[in-house]
């Protein structure tokens, strides 16, 4: 299976997302695509986390609302099919409401990792929905279903191989398989993030399949 990886700049705008979709479907071959969050999104999520740490709920909510408006605008640029447009906007509303929910709890590094993970969850869901709108047989394989690191923060290769092989044996008949670049589960089954360069591990792992 062909493997392609795109960073945040490559999916940094609706136009660039469209370009990525053209590129990954051009060969017609089954392709595993690893995506990062849209450029700027991770920085915004870190800023939101910093506000939550300081218990500045208004500050956090302001950034969340700005980010939500931006993504809603992106949805209008990408999704001309009204049904798909409504579905993706409903998904976006749910994600941003989820971000706002952190104002009710004690905020720790555990919650921060969950907040930061939302960037890749947003980008991969949007790209997958756009591909489907264009008639491409595409599916999203959440990285949290297979990607795991051990207590040394290194990819747990045995676990990853086992899980991804099982998933791909079930998810057949697709041209494009989308997943996230950095989010994962840690040795304690908590949401975590790979270290810098971690998505390279992910790409290498799929290339070896």
Identify the meaning behind each predicted range.
Residues 1-208:
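Nucleotide/pyrophosphate-binding catalytic subdomain
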